[in-house]
Design a protein with these regions (language model features):
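Short, flexible domain-boundary/linker segments around small modular repeats
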Residues: 1-23, 28-29, 70-87, 131-135
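Acidic (E/D-rich), amphipathic helical modules within compact regulatory domains
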Residues: 19-62
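Glycine-rich, aromatic-bearing surface loops/beta-hairpins
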Residues: 113-135
Length: 135
């Protein structure tokens, strides 16, 4: 994995300068298999298939505390707003945290994201068009 490519993709995600599909493409090209966004530690960890890990900060200020319970409807609404209306990542982050998301893992090869709340409750969302018929 190339740390400079990952750092640039992370920065571009936070400031909204490139769309999510382009971020995924760049990360996969540099060997990222999955990433873990941690809203408590305010960092994202990027993992390769060989076990290499690169961490970048989430440098947003004044984020709300993670809500006590995972509100799947509010989370799904935030996800759809990002997918369909190009919602800025900062806004998505705030809405996800208010919906009780403590963190999530984006499985790039698997084309899905699993979100979880403070009590371990989970929600998995497929990348647009990637959900198999049997899922």
């Amino acid at each position: 994995m190339k740390s400079e490519v990952i750092a640039e993709a992370a920065r571009a995600t936070l400031d909204g300068s490139i769309p999510f599909p382009e971020v995924v493409r760049r990360l996969m090209e540099t060997g990222v298999e999955y990433s873990h966004v941690d809203y408590v530690a305010l960092q994202t960890s990027f993992y390769s298939a060989t076990g290499e890990v690169i961490k970048t900060p989430i440098n947003y200020e004044k984020l709300p505390p993670v809500a006590n319970n995972l509100d799947r409807d509010a989370l799904r609404s935030a996800i759809l707003d990002s997918q369909q209306n190009g919602q800025p990542y900062r806004d998505f982050t705030e809405r996800a945290i208010k919906a009780g998301v403590q963190g999530y893992i984006a499985f790039l090869r698997g084309k899905r994201v699993t979100y979880w709340g403070r009590d371990g409750e989970q929600h998995t969302e497929w990348f647009p068009g990637a959900k198999p018929d049997n899922a």
